[in-house]
């Protein structure tokens, strides 16, 4: 897995959190991150895709997440919401990224930025979502 992509995901989670908390324009957040953070080792194109396309597809993404929640969406930690949204986006719109990579990356980001055991919840939601969105990929993996 690409270190530059991992860094893009981490920065995207931070930027999506900022967007949700402040509702600042995405272009301004994008510009701020490029100017104020070390983005030299980040896959900038992927960061920008995540930052701009996740909000563009937020209703579809959130519908997938809502399907598996055991509590109101508003009670989910905002950082963990951002991580779940990133994971669901990749599961839905980036079939080139293997589902295991999506889940592993999200879990690792949740361990760094989320609440103490938040990564377990992120894992369970993304695992359930992957079973729905990537059923053929999971089936192929089991039969090989």
Identify the meaning behind each predicted range:
Residues 1-144:
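N-terminal interaction/assembly modules
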